[in-house]
Structures are given as C-alpha cells and as structure tokens.
A protein has these predicted regions:
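Interdomain hinge/lid region at the active-site interface
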Residues: 224-295
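Glycine-rich, N-terminal phosphate-binding loop of Rossmann-like dinucleotide-binding domains
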Residues: 76-78, 111, 163
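Phosphate-coordination loops involved in phosphoryl transfer and adenosine-cofactor binding
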Residues: 13-16, 104, 156
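NAD(P)+-binding Rossmann beta1-loop-alpha1 motif at the extreme N-terminus of oxidoreductases
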Residues: 2-68, 72
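Internal alpha-helical scaffold of NAD(P)-dependent oxidoreductase catalytic cores
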Residues: 151-238
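Rossmann-like NAD(P)-binding element
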Residues: 64-106
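Rossmann-like NAD(P)(H) cofactor-binding subdomain of soluble oxidoreductases
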Residues: 88-148
Length: 304
C-alpha cells in the first residue's frame, strides 16, 4: 500500500503532496506546490480538469496505492465530499500511518466550515489511526474552478487551524507538521482555534459578507447603476458573484451562526431606516458616528 513517509524529516516543506479536488483552492495548492518543486498527486472527478492539471502541475493520480507517498494530503472540496473521501480512504490512510512513531501523511481540509467536517474527520482518524487537522486558508477570489487557480494565491494569507482533541505534545507535533508542510505556499499567519469558534466567527467575517453582497444587487436600482457607481459599489458587490452550490452548503452547515448575524444586521439596518423615515438627522449622525468609531477601533487594534 505504498511507503510510509515521515513529514518531520522534510524540513522546508513536503517532498510529495496529495490534493483532492482541483477547484480554485485545490488547484492553487497544486500549482503552488508544483512551482516549489514538490511532487503533486491529485484526484478530481472531472477528467478534463485532471488532464489540464497534468500539464506541468500534477505528476500522477492520488489513490489508495499512492497516498502513502504523500507527506500531506489536502482535501479541497465541498464539506460532504471531504467526509465521503475520508470514509472511503480511511483504511488506506491508516495503512500508510504509524501512530507509534507519528509517521505518515497528515491530512488537512480547506472547507469554510469546520464543525461538520472536523467532527466526522476526527472520529475517523481516531477509529482508524491516521492524522487529521482542520484547516481554512483565508484566501480566494470571486471566481471558482481550476482555470482561476494561482500558485501565489496563499502568499501572505492567514491559515486557521483546528487540531484534534489529543494530548498537548501530539497536538503541537501535528500543528508543527502542518505549518512545515504548507511552508512553500507562503502563508503569512497561523491561528489555532476550535471548530465551534471558527464557525461562529466565519459566519460574520465571510458568509454574512456574501449574503449582503448577493442581496444588495437584487435592488431594482442595480439595473441602472452604470455611470453612477465607483469604488463603493464595486467593493460591496465583488462577492455577489459566487458559486451557489458551494456557498449554500457552507451556509446550511453553519445555519444558526449565520442566521444570528443576519438578524443582528437587520436590526441595525432597521435603526438607519427609522432615522431616515423620521428625518432624524441627529439620530442618523449618531448611528454613522458609532459605526465609524467601531471600525477605527478595530483597525487600530489590528495595527498593533
């Protein structure tokens, strides 16, 4: 079932990386690794994508026979697809792993929600005996698909990690391995959190922004915006262009947290609407000043 590799010996990054799913994120992992001289094995259900990726990026197919050659395996697909792949290949991952020596490929995902994926992945890893760490690269564009992937997509980007509930020594070992394995991709900052905290915060920082942008362009006035719009319109509508299948799955998997954020936003917008309907300039000015003050404080905190 292939050879067992020890990620710890490959200082500076992996020698071989496996990628499951060659969309924007998976394709960017593949291109980034290939550009750094890392051998890339991959699998994607679309034969045309595999053919395109084989031209200078992917060296071969990732399967049960070859996954043991990898130092890291990146699951870059939708939540249910990640879980399904792990369930199908759990035994092969176990066969490629020596838990006594902490050897074998470390598996990470790139899914935008962590709760549903990490719960099942940690369970499978514990039952079968392989290593999994939840991960979420905070990078992307409004486009999707391998054609839009870039080798430099993750340069300077944050990477959020969700380790399993294991003893501190093993947790530090796994986190260290992941950081070493993604080094060639140029991530700028690493954060460690729990799956529940990740999903609570990401509902605000990412999912809500997509909902707001997507809803904003549904105004009938959007049909006549040309010639009247500049940076504000462009910034607010950038992520209205999205992958509905992927984002609906992510949002449903984080439904409670996202619904909370939407309801809170509706309440805030209601205050602005009341001020306008009442022609209450002082109240409106206070609302605007409050938002400005909060944003400045957040920016100052981030700068320090």
């Amino acid at each position: 079932m292939g050879t067992v590799r020890n990620a710890r010996v490959n200082q500076g990054g992996p020698k071989c990386a496996g990628i499951v799913g060659l969309g924007l994120i998976g394709g960017s992992f593949a291109r980034g690794y290939a550009q750094a001289g890392v051998r890339v094995l991959a699998w994607d259900p679309d034969d045309d994508v595999m053919t395109a990726a084989s031209m200078g990026t992917v060296a071969g197919e990732l399967n049960d026979e070859t996954l043991g050659e990898c130092d890291i395996i990146v699951l870059a697909c939708y939540p249910e697809a990640c879980i399904e792949w792990l369930e199908t290949h759990a035994q092969a991952l176990a066969d490629a792993t020596d838990t006594e020596a902490i050897m074998g490929p470390v598996v990470i995902d790139t899914v935008g929600v962590k709760g549903i994926v990490c719960e099942r992945a940690f369970e499978l890893a514990r039952e079968h005996g392989f290593y999994f760490v939840g991960a979420h690269p905070m990078a992307g564009t409004q486009f999707s698909g391998y054609a839009h992937s870039r080798a430099d997509l993750f340069q300077g980007a944050p990477l959020v990690l969700v380790p399993p509930a294991v003893d501190d020594a093993l947790k530090l070992e796994l986190l260290g391995q992941v950081r070493e394995m993604v080094r060639p991709l140029g991530f700028g900052k690493f954060s460690v959190t729990s799956a529940s905290e990740h999903d609570r915060v990401i509902a605000f920082t990412s999912q809500l922004a997509h909902v707001v942008s997507n809803a904003y362009v549904k105004s009938p006035t959007a049909q006549v915006h040309h010639g009247f719009s500049a940076g504000s319109y462009r910034d607010l509508t950038r992520v209205a262009h999205l992958n509905p299948q992927m984002w609906s799955e992510l949002m449903i998997d984080d439904a409670d947290a996202l619904a909370f954020e939407i309801d809170h936003l509706i309440d805030s917008l209601g205050a602005y609407s009341r001020a306008l309907k009442d022609r209450d300039q002082r109240y409106l000015e206070n609302l605007l000043a409050e938002g400005d003050r909060i944003k400045r404080a957040l920016d100052d905190e981030a700068a320090h």
